Every structure is written in C-alpha cells, then in structure tokens.
Amino acid sequence: MFDIALRSGPARGGVSHRVRTCDTVDGGYQCFPRLSHRWGQYSPYFSLANTGLPSEVPEKCELTFVQVLSRHGARYPTASKSKKYKSLIQAIQANATAYNGQSVFLRAYNYTLGSEDLTSFGEHQMINSGIKFYQRYAALTRDHVPFIRSSDSSRVVASGQLFIQGYEQSKAQDCDADHSQDHAAINVLISEAPGANNTLNHNTCAAFEADKLGDQVSAKYTALIAPPMAQRLHHDLPGVTLTDDQVIYLMDMCAYDTVATTPGATSLSPFCALFTDTEWSQYNYLQSLGKYYGYGAGNPLGPTQGVGFINELIARMTHSPVHDHTTSNRTLDAPGADSFPTNRTLYADFTHDNGMIPIFFALGLYNGSDPLPHDRIVPATQADGYSAAWAVPFAARAYIEMMQCGRETEPLVRVLINDRVAPLKGCNVDQLGRCKRSDFVNALSFAQDGGDWAKCGVSSK
C-alpha cells in the first residue's frame, strides 16, 4: 500500500493548483516501491534515511556548513532516446498480429512523451527538495542565503529555480527567519559547451570522452538478461522481433511513462507489467553497471572527472583559494571572485547524474566495495551503498555537512546521499560516519593531486 498526498503545484499564470502526488517532502517517491525503487537512475528520489546510520544531527552538535549537490528532477527521455522509443512502438504496432497477456495495451498506445525537459512531476520533486533543504537545515537557512550554481542545461537550471521556489516558500512561512535578506537566486551558470571547464559536467577529458567501457559492460550484461525476456515478449506479440536493446527500451518506458503521465506520478505505466520482479532487479543492476563502469570507479578515468568539484569543496570548507588544474574554471574560481565566494555557510549546486557519480567516487564514498561483477547482481546493501537508484535517482541530493560538536576543537564532516549517511573513507571515522575536517581534507589526496588528469590528453583552461 502507499499514500498519495495533496500539495500545491507550481504557479502558472499566477494560479497555484492542487496536485495528487506520490512525492512527499520527507520520504520522496514511495508509490509502487518494489518497482520504482529499482529503475536505476530513472527512479524518482526516495529517502534512504532508514538504511544505515542515524541521519539526524547528533545531540550537542551545531551545524556550521552545508553543501547540497543535486541532480535535476524527473525528465522526459533525451531527444535521441525519445525518437527510438517512438519508432519501437510504431514498429510493434505495424508488425504485431496479436496482443496477448500484459501487452494488450500496446495495440492502442500513443507515444506522446516530449524530450529533455522536466515533467510536471519532476518540477514538483524539485520544489519539495527546496522545502526539505530549508526545513532540515532551518538553524542555518533562517539566517543565511545559499550561494547557488547550476550547469547551464535548461532542465538543470529549471531544477535550481524550482528548488529555490520551495526554499523561499518555506522561508516565507517561517516566523523565525530573517526576512530582510535577499531571496536566493542562481548566482552562477556554468557552460556545458564542448571543451568548457565545468566542475559540474564532464566534457574536457578527451581520453575519458572517447572511452566506451560503460557501454561495453552494459551491452555484455544486456546480452545475458534480455534474450529470455525477448522470448516471452515474442510469444505475446507474434510477428514482432525485438533486439536486446529494444527489450531494455520497453523497460525504460515503464519509468518514463510513469513520471510523465500524471503530474504526481500516481499511475503506474502498463509497460511495467511486461516484466517480472526478477527482471526489474536485473534492470536495476544493468543501470548500476553502466554508471559504475561509465563514470565511477570501474572506469580508470571516471573518478578523475569529479576531482575539480572536490577541490572546490575543499576551498569552501577551509575558506581558502581553489587549487585545481583539472575541470575548474579559473576565471570563475579566481581568488576573491564574486562567482566563487569561500565565506558562505550554505552552498547549492545543480547538475546531472553523470556529473554526480564521478564526484561521489572521487570522494571515495563507495571504496568499501569490490568491483561490480558483470554477470551477477550485487545489491546496494552489499556494494557499500552503491547502486544507480540509491546514488543518482531523479532529484538526487547529496548533503555535505560540517558540525561543531561538544569540546571538539575543529568541525566534523559528514556526507549523506539521499538521506543515507555514507561513512567516510580514508580518515579516522567515528561511529556516526564522521571525520574531523583536517582528516577529511587530507584523505582527499587523490583529488588534490589532480587524480589521473595527466592521462586525459588535455590541459585545463
């Protein structure tokens, strides 16, 4: 069973409307969890607060700094994928001589999905994310305005703006907040143009961009799991012949159709019933493999794509200039530049899943796991908390906190990924997953040394 909440939707033309939604501020998306929490990076954000260490701020601790790193909200397929999905549906309808079992709906299904932009549900996700950030960190948000950056993709910028809408909505309702301050706004847009230095987006490491390891591993696993599914679908759809990739496209449609059909994603797409429970576990692992070997530790240059952001994070946490020769923009990050202050208490950055995965691995958050095997499922609970659905769902968010506790002489650092405390690696971690700031910074030597940027074949700008 699941609960469907009512909330105010984004104002359009000055009119706010009520929306039935499966997304809540605290819990994220909790409808159809046996399926929706296994859609890899296409899963809508769901809270992992109850999967590990306590996520509350410990007693006798006072927060002094928070950085949020967020993925955009749920979107329509990319333009290239949307074209493939539509062509597949048309081919099925042109060739099927019958529609048996769960495939009956395909006879009359009309593909109407857009491309690239946020869905209405994705918009609501980001408003909720802003509300949650304000409320979770009210001790700071009442009196401090976050410094906000966004990669300049339209859906990422829109996500940042909607986050701000939720944030300011909560602040306006908080009687204890300082209402004399300026409203939060996106302070810096960072170009995603090819070759532009951008710590929130990979595109400047030539050797990495040319690498196809993630695609190769995904293709190998797809060839393992898709044929039995295709055999069943061919029985249900006589006259139709599906490739392995097309089987996966039909699985993709389950998630995309669900987050697009209703504003609150309250209706499960009929595409979902085409596949079994076991097959959804396989699909989830397929997506995890793709991210791990495409952008994470499975790729020799994956974590290197995240070191620029880590070096910016160090600068923010230590109130010092950025020391980086990889993806940072030296003009934007110049010492004393208004575009990169290091004296703020709150920071927010908005990007894509493929921008976040390298950052998480550059932080070493999943270093407690062996490399993911290509031929069997290793769930997140056995992979140091890593899976695509647990790490980078739609509207994913990482919180990096500093807190002053009791008689400690320096602040402690803690990282939460979708509300799950990710115990830090490489430093003297305590029972709550935290390290002292100096120890945390020292543990980030991979980033401070530039990772393996020398293997990229380019020089930073």
From Swiss-Prot:
Active site positions: 72 (nucleophile)
Superkingdom field: Eukaryota
Biotechnology remark: Phytic acid is the major storage form of phosphorus in plant seeds and, thus, in seed-based animal feed. Phytases are therefore of considerable economic interest.
E.C. designation(s): 3.1.3.-, 3.1.3.8
Subunit structure: Monomer.
CDD domains: HP_HAP_like
Residues involved in 1D-myo-inositol hexakisphosphate binding: 41-42, 71-72, 75, 78, 155, 291, 352-353
Xref: Gene3D superfamilies: Phosphoglycerate mutase-like (3.40.50.1240)
Catalytic activity entry: 1D-myo-inositol hexakisphosphate + H2O = 1D-myo-inositol 1,2,4,5,6-pentakisphosphate + phosphate; 1D-myo-inositol 1,2,4,5,6-pentakisphosphate + H2O = 1D-myo-inositol 1,2,5,6-tetrakisphosphate + phosphate; 1D-myo-inositol 1,2,5,6-tetrakisphosphate + H2O = 1D-myo-inositol 1,2,6-trisphosphate + phosphate; 1D-myo-inositol 1,2,6-trisphosphate + H2O = 1D-myo-inositol 1,2-bisphosphate + phosphate
Species annotation: Penicillium oxalicum
Matching InterPro entries: Acid_Pase_AS (IPR033379), His_Pase_clade-2 (IPR000560), His_PPase_superfam (IPR029033), Histidine_acid_Pase_euk (IPR016274)
pH dependence: Optimum pH is 4.5.
Disulphide bridges, residue numbers: 22-31, 61-405, 205-456, 254-272, 427-435
Pfam families tied to this protein: His_Phos_2
Record-given protein name: Phytase A
Glycosylated residues in this chain: 95, 110, 197, 329, 343, 367
Major localization class: secreted
Protein role: Catalyzes the phosphate monoester hydrolysis of phytic acid (myo-inositol hexakisphosphate), which results in the stepwise formation of myo-inositol pentakis-, tetrakis-, tris-, bis-, and monophosphates, as well as the liberation of inorganic phosphate. Myo-inositol 2-monophosphate is the end product.
Keywords carried by this UniProt record: Disulfide bond, Glycoprotein, Hydrolase, Secreted
Similarity-based family: Belongs to the histidine acid phosphatase family.
Activity's thermal dependence: Optimum temperature is 55 degrees Celsius.
Gene Ontology CC terms: extracellular region
Enzyme class: hydrolase
PTM characteristics: Glycosylated.
Location of this chain's protein in the cell: Secreted
